[in-house]
Amino acid sequence: MKILVIQGPNLNMLGHRDPRLYGMVTLDQIHEIMQTFVKQSNLDVELEFFQTNFEGEIIDKIQESVGSDYEGIIINPGAFSHTSIAIADAIMLAGKPVIEVHLTNIQAREEFRKNSYTGAACGGVIMGFGPLGYNMALMAMVNILAEMKAFQEAQQNNPNNSINNINN
């Protein structure tokens, strides 16, 4: 299973950016932690990482995932969470599970950070757990995709389901 991890603006500055809020872990270290989790858990998962500070590039990357072999997306849109209806629209058209991650609890921050347009478009939001939130999102995504696959297989193998009856 292939999962796309999209990182938004200023996340490339983790380790330098306000350590009391974001800690000292860098973005590369977060990605290494995720890869280690995949290996230690013996998951059949391939992760692709993408970081940009540009809204349009996030939208392009989500759109490129449509019809691709990416089965799910984990996204931290950073501050675009609070401003980008365009990214929210792209998430809604992705046609696959999307989970939003935030290192901090955006509900405990400034008032303008409490609304997440992009989070409302996602299947779920994980926030406030620091770098661990990415592995939490990864665990959730693997489970969601496994459930979807099992459901699809059950539908295909059940001769009494309505789709098979329509085709007969």
UniProtKB/Swiss-Prot annotation:
Transition state stabilizer, annotated site positions: R17
EC number: 4.2.1.10
Keywords, in A-Z order: Amino-acid biosynthesis, Aromatic amino acid biosynthesis, Lyase
Reactions catalysed according to its record: 3-dehydroquinate = 3-dehydroshikimate + H2O
Pathway assignment: Metabolic intermediate biosynthesis; chorismate biosynthesis; chorismate from D-erythrose 4-phosphate and phosphoenolpyruvate: step 3/7
Positions of the catalytic residues: Y22 (proton acceptor), H102 (proton donor)
Positions that bind substrate: N76, H82, D89, L103, T104, R113
GO biological process, one term: quinate catabolic process
One example GO MF annotation: 3-dehydroquinate dehydratase activity
InterPro entries, per database record: DHquinase_II (IPR001874), DHquinase_II_CS (IPR018509), DHquinase_II_sf (IPR036441)
One Pfam family it belongs to: DHquinase_II
Source organism, top-level taxon: Bacteria
Subunit structure: Homododecamer.
NCBIfam families assigned to the protein according to its UniProt record, in alphabetical order: aroQ, PRK05395.1-2, PRK05395.1-3, PRK05395.1-4
Biological function: Catalyzes a trans-dehydration via an enolate intermediate.
Family per similarity comment: Belongs to the type-II 3-dehydroquinase family.
Protein's UniProt name: 3-dehydroquinate dehydratase
Gene that encodes it: aroQ
